[in-house]
Amino acid sequence: MIEDDPSIADMYRVQLEHDGYRVTVATTAELGFITVAENSPDLVLLDLLLPDRSGFEVLISLNERLPNHPPVVILSNYGEPSMIDRGRSLGAVEYLVKSRVTPADISSQIPTWIAVGRRGGQGES
């Protein structure tokens, strides 16, 4: 998970670990990219508003430098259609607005997102 807000990261981490997932949290875009490159996680949950770069820039870097990167789900406070379209056009398998989903909702969808990523799909729900 690439999320700079400790309380939000902790909320998701607690639920995901409870459900059996191993979670690593990176608090900046740079640390997030390094973590993905070094650990090859099954899925990346990506915030857009990060202290050093935007989540979109992280996704672009993943696409350019790690073409076989794991599937990416964007979790953002921004729900504008143009933002959602941009995220999906950059290859995110899903774009979720934080206020509209719970950590349990996210946890229940992880197997689907991983499967979509393995098939090479993007922007599917």
What annotation goes with each model-predicted range?
Residues 6-24:
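Two-component/phosphorelay signaling modules centered on CheY-like receiver
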